[in-house]
Amino acid sequence: MHGHVTLISCSPEAAAIIASGGRISTMDGTADEIYAKSLAAGQEKNEKLIGKVLSSGHTSVLEHCYANLSFENVSVLAEQFLIEFRLASFTVKSRRYVDFSGAGYVAPDFSDPAQAAAFDAAVRALFGIYDELEAAGVPKEDARFVLPYCFCSNFFCSMNARELVHVMNELTYGRGSGIPELRALGESLFAQCEARLPFLALRKPEVYRRTPDWTPQAAQPLVPDAPVTVLSAAQDAGRKICDAYLLARGLAPQPLRKDEQTELLKTLLARPRRRELEQASYTLLFGGLSLAALTHLTRHRMQSLCPPQLLQNIRYDRYVLPQSVRDKGMEARYRRAGRTGRGAAARSRRGRVCPVLPDAQRPDGPCAHDDECGRALCLLPPALLHARAVGDPRRRLSGARRPARGLAGVV
């Protein structure tokens, strides 16, 4: 099965809106008058102006146009890649509540029929274990941990046109270009823009061309010794937040008694606008996140997340084991899923092909070549543990150390 992306809709009169943004800074008249002039100017003149404005580097005008996309039956690997774009909104079919036994999967193209057959057999085996877990009473949110990362995902995505141009180029020429499925999605979006919004079909292969990574010679693999480590924290965070609160009200910052600071923070937290909290920033190291947990963390947009690349850092021998699996007597079958994915990926690497991760696993060690990387990754289960994710979440630090519900441990 091969999925696709559809440009469902975009802002009405997109060219006129963007052109109006280009005109307003240099033209007399009100906003409404300038928009009326842009409508009267027609598509050709507006597109010509847009090209001129963009060539001058003023790409922010594209943000006045909004696009809505649907991704149908793409791999979860593609979903994970896409949700990392923070200037976009995503609504994804939940694996916690929906039965995915018949979801289907995206199979990479294999030149060797034997490898294709081995891949299909491994994926079907993982789906079979998922069915067994569900039949035994394991909740869907725990059974999903054995599904391979090639299983189909469906979701809606909305973003402004500037971000859309960025996403298309990353898929086609940048970080996604090494995976055929991602590159094909990028080409499809370019083709749809060329047909409907030609002024957005801005190909930038030189800008997005990937450069080799640089690594210090003495660099050693990171082995976190705690589920969450605070790498850096704001000094005197309470004072900074209180100072920002006072400044926002035209008052001079001043030392407050403990009871005054407490009262101020209570007042702030009772209000819907709490921007003062952003003065206190934290950098956290998450050690041993499952791929499923990483997906949830990624969806929090107000953070700077730096997860290791799956290809270079995945290991199939470390994964979370939900308590519900043990309670239902399905531990042996669950572990079988890990061995199935590990064996299939090893065979793929020997053939220089690299997607079948189950969702429970975590990336910690070397994986495979990047030339046809999507193949081994497709076998990853979401239970795999992603041992190195560095983030800068600005909220809910106090909840970061709470263990995931129902996890019996890491194996």
Language-model features: where?
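A conserved ligand/cofactor-binding region detector
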Residues: 1-411
